Amino acid sequence: MTRVLDSLPSVSSDLQARIKAAPRNAVAHRALMAEVPAMSALQSGGQAALDALTDSVSVVAWNVERCLFPEDTASHIQPLAPQVVLLSEVDHGMARTGQRHTTEAMAKALEMAYVFGVEFHELDLGGPTEQAFCTDDFNLFGWHGNAILSAVPPERVTLIRLDDHGHWFSSDEVPADPDQPRLGGRMAIAAVLPTEAGPICVVSTHLESNADADHRHAQFDRLLRAIDAFAPDMPVLIGGDLNTGNHLPPDFDWQRETLFELARARGYDWSATPDGVTTRPSLITPHPDRQMKLDWFCTRGMRSTENRLVSSVDENGRPLSDHDAVWCRVALD
């Protein structure tokens, strides 16, 4: 059972030093993960406005690229009246986002409850374009992860880790990015939410970018199995950045991913996802290599009645993220 806390324990300076000095391999990574309580817990907070959702639910999934501007990001999706928001790449105690708890700030602005989980403990300030936003030369907590915002209080939540070998840490064994040293790995958060038609399970996830289709297939298989154990025979909505097409040269085509058929074979449907590519140039990623379709909804036991791709460019022409948001409305049959 995942522990749910009011705040996540920080990493001590002694442990931080040992993490930075440790061998860069999977064995060391797994041992260090076991010493960081926040890696196996979730943080909850905020204030839910409703007791139960209706049988028609408005959902946004958005990779907010660190969430440089939490209040503006919340304001940008407010016209959609979301009852569930599935976030990826949210910072908590990072210098590049003013040491803020960006999930908490968004939840407050939207008057929603939240659950936040750590994907990575960041060991540095980030890449060159991110360092331009740093307000300090240190990270207060160094947390970076996923979140679920909800207009209702979750009945149950769980953290689902999708790997433990240290894909961004174990540079002795895998091609880790030297500009982004990290402890942790890809993960998902699942929450059971009450609705007038009965409980549903919503899932915020983020699959691996620095890997091929087989790696993401294995992660998605692990995710679906974990959902079956957590919320058997329940309507499910999964949303997030699945990094489809990454490391699939020469065309980087999302249609070559095998996870789509994997999900269909288990009763899931992808039609809640709007058409179109979901990436764009941003303040942190001003010159992306290509445009890609990375962000998806995957549902079981519910029906999509509307969907839309929502530009991340705000009313002042500023991109809030290198991903556009995806929005859908689902009906519970």
Locate the predicted segments by residue.
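Residues that flank catalytic or metal-binding motifs in active/ligand-binding sites
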Residues: 55, 102, 143-145, 185-189, ...
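Structured beta-strand-rich core segments of catalytic domains in phosphoester-bond hydrolases
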Residues: 4-11, 15-43, 91-197
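Active-site beta-strand/loop signature of hydrolases that rely on acidic residues for catalysis
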Residues: 58-63, 73-99, 115-119, 149, ...
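Active site of divalent-metal-dependent phosphoester/diester hydrolases
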Residues: 4, 113-148, 244-320
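Eukaryote-specific, low-hydrophobicity, charge-rich regions
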Residues: 30-61, 74-84, 113
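Short, flexible loop segments at the rims of nucleotide/cofactor-binding pockets, characterized by
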Residues: 61-66, 92-93, 177-181, 212-215
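Short catalytic/ligand-binding loop motif for oxyanion handling, primarily in non-cytosolic enzymes
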Residues: 70, 93-96, 123-126, 157, ...
